[in-house]
């Protein structure tokens, strides 16, 4: 939440789970809520991943729209991707999904009307299990 525009009454901020809010406005900490102020003059993804590394966070799930996901993919900041494709839904318009680079298909599973494709980043294939 770069400019802290999200309403504070969202469940995201209820402090039931440890939450980190990366932003350009403030640095503050509560029980399970950390506001981490980023340097607006630096690469945001580099700064976020460095901060997470320093906090010893070893796994991150990135959920977002195509622009957010494409940013992580473009910087090579992904190890695994799960792509869910609904085989029965037809949309006339919409946003294009991100384009994955260096992907290796590991497996596919069918779940109801969905196909779940598991990809790994080909750059790291030696360490994948």
What are these regions (language model features)?
Residues 1-58, 67-70, 125-128:
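Active-site ligand-binding patch in enzyme domains
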Residues 57-60, 64, 74, 82-84:
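Helical hairpin unit composed of two closely spaced alpha helices linked by a short loop
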Residues 25, 87, 121-123:
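Non-catalytic surface loops within mature trypsin-like serine protease
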Residues 1, 7, 85, 93, ...:
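Residue-level signal for pocket-adjacent positions within structured domains
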Residues 64-71, 88-90:
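Small/polar glycine-rich anion-binding or flexible loop at a beta-alpha turn
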Residues 11, 73-76, 94-96:
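Short amphipathic alpha-helical segments
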């Amino acid at each position: 939440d770069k400019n802290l525009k999200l309403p504070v009454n969202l469940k995201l901020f209820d402090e039931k789970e440890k939450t980190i809010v990366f932003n350009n406005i403030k640095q503050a900490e509560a029980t399970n809520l950390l506001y981490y102020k980023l340097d607006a003059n630096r690469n945001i993804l580099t700064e976020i991943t460095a901060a997470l590394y320093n906090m010893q966070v070893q796994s991150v799930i990135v959920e977002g729209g195509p622009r957010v996901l494409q940013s992580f993919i473009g910087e090579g900041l992904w190890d695994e991707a799960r792509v869910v494709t609904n085989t029965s839904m037809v949309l006339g318009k919409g946003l294009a999904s991100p384009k994955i680079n260096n992907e290796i298909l590991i497996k596919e599973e069918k779940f109801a009307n969905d196909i779940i494709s598991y990809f790994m980043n080909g750059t790291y294939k030696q360490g994948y299990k």
